[in-house]
Amino acid sequence: MINICIIKPNNYIHSLAYLEIAELLHYSILDLKKKSKITYNFIDINSKVTNIIFGAHLLNDEMINSLPGNTIIFNTEQIESINEVWKKRILLLAKKEIIFWDYSEHNLKFLLNKLDIKGKLFEIGFQKNLQRIETKEKKEVDVLFYGSMNNRREKIINNLLKKNVKVKCLFGVYGKERDDWIATSKLVLNLHFYDSKIFEIVRVFYLLINAIPVVSEIDNHTKFNNNYLEGIKKSNYENIERNIFDLLEDENERKSIGINGMNSIKKYPQINFTKSILNL
């Protein structure tokens, strides 16, 4: 049995950002004919259960001390850019010989070189169960952006608004409500937040699975380790507005990007990646 645990403090809705990646893992484990469940704030101490934790930086010290030795921490943060408190938590977890999974080879290199922690790469692929966004024929939104705001993101969005582009920004909106906005948007915009510039596959894979057109910031400094870049509209920061304008005028090209995205990730069934990392 695998217990996929999402750490969600009271009144902290942002833990729901882990739901799709947790479901990706959960459904692929079920496809392997193994037992799996998704829980919130529940650490199973049964020796026959493996706990895989999302949001481990939200664990308090008491919970960290109670973790079984076979626990797996699934990191989705860009470690180079996280705060010192989380880095200290990572070191505390490492002393307990907890296993670390990460979606990014760059993160894993940072863990090894800076914190002397060896982790395992979790590759992200296609899971049919997550094909569930039914796009609307009539699009009310030109560009959808969801996530935290900072100056570099705000600059692009404000420039689009000044050009009368219908931009919808969401923060703290997850699950079905966010999916409904995706369904009625012409495209989704992905912009780097951190200077580490790791490609945000954890944010984008769900869009690819659902054939949603994605415009993503990609430049010579972007770090990525997947084969899905052919399925998105790649843009450096300076050209991203121009590329958005062009796509908004070309419905066929938008549809083509969405289909290419889905086909690019479909080549890599998640069951194979999950089987490999679990040594099944």
Language-model features: locations:
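Nucleotide-sugar donor-binding catalytic core of glycosyltransferases
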Residues: I2-K48, G55-L229, N272, S276
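Short alpha-helical scaffold segments that flank and stabilize functional sites
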Residues: L25, D219, D246, G261-S264
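Hydrophobic residues at beta-strand termini and immediately following loops
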Residues: F122, K234-S235
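C-terminal low-complexity, acidic/polar tails when present
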Residues: K223-I232, I240, R254
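C-terminal "capping" alpha-helix adjacent to the active site of nucleotide-linked donor transferases
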Residues: N236-E253
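A charged, aromatic-enriched C-terminal amphipathic alpha-helix characteristic of glycosyltransferases
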Residues: L248-L280
